[in-house]
Amino acid sequence: MGCTSERACKVRVVRRKLVVFVPVSALESVCEALFAAGAGHIGGYERCAWYTPGMGTFLAGEGAAPTIGEVGQERRIGEYRLETVYPTELEADVVRALLESHPYEEPVFDLYELLEPEV
């Protein structure tokens, strides 16, 4: 890392990033729920998010209750990859808001630790 002192090399986790794939039609409602739970704050800014369009594909198997399509039918659907940040202490609230607002039976999402230098 090229650190000159031990203090300069220490990092801590104070925020995390949520990445989730959301159907185009649900982007606004999922964002609103996440922001209401405390996600999207960066410094003096609120409601911060980044999203990019893509295409999701899935095949609902027996026992599934798909929101879109039917069991045994492969589907392709326009989705957004949505990213936002949140303080670590709000993780339970943010994940709960995601699961309650996302239309999919089993939403795909990742949680990443964001390292920040201790100063």
What are these regions (language model features)?
Residues 1-119:
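Hydrophobic structural segments
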